[in-house]
Amino acid sequence: MQKSADKSLKDRYLDLLSQQFNTKEELATEIINLESILELPKGTEHFVSDLHGEFHAFQHVLRNGSGNVRSKINDIFQDTLTRKEINEFSALVYYPEEKLKIIKNSFSSKSELNEWYITTINRLIKLITYASSKYTRTKLRKSLPKNYVFIIEELLYKSNKYNNKHSYYETLINQIIELEQSDDLIIGLSFTVQHLVVDHLHVVGDIYDRGPEPDKIMETLIDYPSVDIQWGNHDVLWIGAYAGSKVCLANLLRICARYDNLDIIEDAYGINLRPLLTLAEKHYDGKNKAFRPKNAEGLTELELEQITKIHQAIAIIQFKLEAPIIKRRPTFEMEERLVLESINYEKNEATLYGKTYPLENTCFQTIDPNGPNKLTDEESEVMDKLLLSVQQSEKLKRHMTFLMQKGTLYLPYNGNLLIHGCIPVDENGEMESMVINDVKCYGRDLLDHFEDYVREAFDHKDIQDDLATDLVWYLWTGKYSSLFGKRAMTTFERYFIKDKTAHKETKNPYYHLREDVNMCKKMLKDFGLDPEQGHIINGHTPVKEIDGEDPIKAEGKMIVIDGGFSKAYQSTTGIAGYTLLYNSFGMQLVAHQHFNSKKHVLLNGADELSIRRVVDKELQRQKIRHTNTGQDIQEKIDILKELMHDRYVN
């Protein structure tokens, strides 16, 4: 009976599919097309991570494809253009709108400008021809500016073999100039180049926090043709806040105050901070040095004091909000983080992990020593208002929804494992387990459980104290979290304890065991990937090149690409981080130098700011059939062949 039902369902599916193809020839054409696509070289994947709100640096890397645009320009024009001309042309391709204005102002006559237009349009056509050489015409057409598809295709596929259409092509370009369409065409062609040199973008976590413009990064990603995201610990903090976690909300507000980025909250997302400021002004001192923002440049003394007060107010609220979760979730094993209960308020000291420390920079004005974890009525009202404002922000809703749609905790893709943080292990390299809802979870299963609960929390934003919402916060700070990757987060100690030994956050053994090739192979196998061919691509931890640390570990099985976009870490890493390119020939790690500014590029030309290093070279050039996309296409082919056999062969 079941077999008959399955057959009936399959027949109905084939009936529906057959409606797309009116004839046998149409069906055959589609199969031929798909089979041919499988033989094309795989597209270039671009991996970035830890963007941390640094929109302009991210934009630059995106526009130049981690040096891929410059590489294509060099390939074509290195023998015909000077270094300066290549720099100028590269800058035009990266920032066409702004560079065009500068170039146009440099010409003294219209005829000179028109000559430049002709030369530049022809160069861009030549560059697109080269950059699109591994794509079908259909795919290229989708990348072209819609208003100029016909004109560009005529120029791309022109042939003067019989010398019949020379004046036709000449007239095309001359008319573009005469009708003042040159600027729009050049801008469109430049963006086409940017999209062609990278087929797919992977963001390996941490779009948010520290930097000033994560919202602009999100808008860019929403408009990007092909992208996926592996959530970072800072990303789940924002997801958690929107999903109803007040403790996640308190954490992200504290971080914004710490890095003087409260403008993100108020101006970018329209969230009203006035209730929090009123509370802070009422209870806290603006001189507390531990709560001064890390970057006070450009702030007035009044602004500095206001941020310092807000910083204290939200930090104390955060510590209070953590306690109820720790108490109702014993499987989180976080009792030592009941920090407000560890304080002897008379002696002004705290006992943590069996050791007693004197406290400094204290701001315990709203804490009742007899019930230190209880929010005051005023604090409770402030958090209610803030959460309501967060969940009513349309822009934040759009950004968080996109994060959920495009994001996962980890991603197996084209034989590689993409993961922001870690896979929790013990010192012997065995997967660490955690009990979630009476189920013992470890390895891939643990990460799957985490992700399921994140999605559940997001789907039930009105519930604030369920296991799902608590687990989103745990991903930010818990010892078995794949995103945090440390035994404890010592935020309290960093504010109030002078002894720096108390600040130490012990990393999960994963971070030194990932140097071991056998360990990495074991992890790849656990995630269903080929341990001989695959790689683990990791973000989260800045690579300290300045100290000789190598981002390529475990004989090339582990590649760490913390982007180093965060200016706060560039002094400790020595560079502006790494990105990764993976094309049909293999993988290249790109080390980036500090990005000055867009203005510097526009005025001085786009000089090379990156150094490439081969990670892995394919013995055989990779085709689309070897990729995830190829698997999807093959499944379509199999179904279409079944339809052909069912409808036309029998």
From Swiss-Prot:
Q: Which GO terms describe its biological process?
A: gluconeogenesis
**Pathway(s) where this gene product acts:** Carbohydrate biosynthesis; gluconeogenesis
Record field: catalytic activity: beta-D-fructose 1,6-bisphosphate + H2O = beta-D-fructose 6-phosphate + phosphate
Any keyword Manganese?
yes
Q: What class of enzyme is it?
A: hydrolase
- Note the SUPFAM superfamilies from the entry: Metallo-dependent phosphatases (SSF56300)
Q: Required co-factor?
A: Mn(2+)
Q: What is its EC number?
A: 3.1.3.11
Database matches in Gene3D superfamilies: 3.60.21.10
An annotated Gene Ontology molecular function: fructose 1,6-bisphosphate 1-phosphatase activity
> Which protein family is it in?
Belongs to the FBPase class 3 family.
What protein name is recorded for this chain?
A: Fructose-1,6-bisphosphatase class 3
